[in-house]
Amino acid sequence: MGLSIGIVGATGQVGQVMRTLLDERDFPASAVRFFASARSQGRKLAFRGQEIEVEDAETADPSGLDIALFSAGSAMSKVQAPRFAAAGVTVIDNSSAWRKDPDVPLVVSEVNFERDAHRRPKGIIANPNCTTMAAMPVLKVLHDEARLVRLVVSSYQAVSGSGLAGVAELAEQARAVIGGAEQLVYDGGALEFPPPNTYVAPIAFNVVPLAGSLVDDGSGETDEDQKLRFESRKILGIPDLLVSGTCVRVPVFTGHSLSINAEFAQPLSPERARELLDGATGVQLVDVPTPLAAAGVDESLVGRIRRDPGVPDGRGLALFVSGDNLRKGAALNTIQIAELLTADL
């Protein structure tokens, strides 16, 4: 017997991928309902040969649902996730609204589902940030072998992580200047870009070392930098893990990448790391990971694994990870958690 599933934010970028994956993975759903904001109410979305009418998430009655997959932003999740949970629905939330709540497990399906997901006093499970997500299946394997103590990370985050607005901004700017792009070889001001709205500087043919928003705490960090630290600690179960991150937006449509320098308590050679990662769940070992290769792939791609000479005693590794921020980074992990929950419901 199947479960009754709802997608809140079904008309959005991640919601679209969720709908596709539910079908592709033959999720055991006896009934499916789609929810979004009031402006999408009444719109019809195709699913498994049916036309399903979108409901207003703020006014719809969630009774009868077993699981609701939320990807409608933090403001919606803060209000509606508890309302759905109060109706007996298990909520899996893709926003940042609940990640820091000590009573809400923050789960990556391959990493900490068994340890954390069965205890959910608020009826909510949080999905991590897409940048953190790409690294977790890789780092968990290495942590189990040699105990992770420190991470220094630079991220290379695709514009789809900013939603449809980020995608549109990159495409518009690239189209506007592509005819004379060679002029930028010698002078970054040689061409006039359409004014940026989503980012603080043009994103086409550029990188912007400020992904997210600056946090008003004197640290000089963005919320993306801080998510990387907090979420890595919570997911891996290492509360004292040292994490320094610089999150950068790059002119890539889909696929977040991370350059990682990892320090361990015990020696760990590149050869042993490759042996551990080859065939690990949620991981694909490759020579040169790229975001283009990762787009549309379920696993995190990891490669360029080498000794970090800045860490003594063979306790440091440098590596590069790429992952699809819309697929595993958001929609897929949510659905994998739902699949694992079927045994509980």
Swiss-Prot record:
Disruption phenotype: Deletion of this gene inhibits bacterial growth. The mutant cells lose an average of 77.8% of their cell wall materials, exhibit altered morphology, and have a reduced capacity to infect macrophages. One of its GO terms (molecular function) is protein dimerization activity. NADP(+) binds at residues 11-14, 39-40, 160-161, 325. GO terms for biological process: 'de novo' L-methionine biosynthetic process; diaminopimelate biosynthetic process; isoleucine biosynthetic process; lysine biosynthetic process via diaminopimelate; threonine biosynthetic process. Gene3D superfamilies: Dihydrodipicolinate Reductase, domain 2, NAD(P)-binding Rossmann-like Domain. Signal peptide: none annotated. This is Aspartate-semialdehyde dehydrogenase.
